[in-house]
UniProtKB/Swiss-Prot annotation:
It catalyses: (R)-4'-phosphopantetheine + ATP + H(+) = 3'-dephospho-CoA + diphosphate. Gene3D superfamilies: HUPs. The gene is coaD. Reversibly transfers an adenylyl group from ATP to 4'-phosphopantetheine, yielding dephospho-CoA (dPCoA) and pyrophosphate. This is Phosphopantetheine adenylyltransferase. It is an enzyme of class 2 (transferase). Keywords: ATP-binding, Coenzyme A biosynthesis, Cytoplasm, Nucleotide-binding, Nucleotidyltransferase, Transferase.
Amino acid sequence: MRKKYRKVVVGGTFDRLHLGHKALLRKAFEVGKIVYIGLTSDEMVRNKPYAERILPYEHRLKDLLKFIEVNGYTNYRIIKIHTAIGFADSMKSLEAIVVSEETYKGALIVNRAREEKGLKPLDIVTIPIIKSYLGDKISSSLIRAGLIDPFGRPLHWKGNSPKDV
């Protein structure tokens, strides 16, 4: 199958790899021939909610590699990033950035930074936010807080099924 873009970028902390992360990564591999994944450094996540519970970089890298391998994806490069923009504002050959509806504004910031450096803005490929069984977005913060699992299921449900709500 022909890919729409030669080189795409996607980035994140990818802590406790959940359905939202997986949808984002799948979209990146669907549209890009080569996928550049910016994985946040340990230093960068210190101010996130429940930061003390965020898995170390090496653990998150291992989980990411396992997901990529299980899905048979090839043609990728994982790069440790130390800022929100990472390398996306300086890599001339990138064509698109894959984000969720929630992180769309970040893509606009990347494009502004690229334009300031004389680079072409990236096409923005957006996926919808993946919801948990309770209707909230699936997020690593909720998983770290012990409220949901990586599939969006509540961990302390008092009732028959979340779908009964």
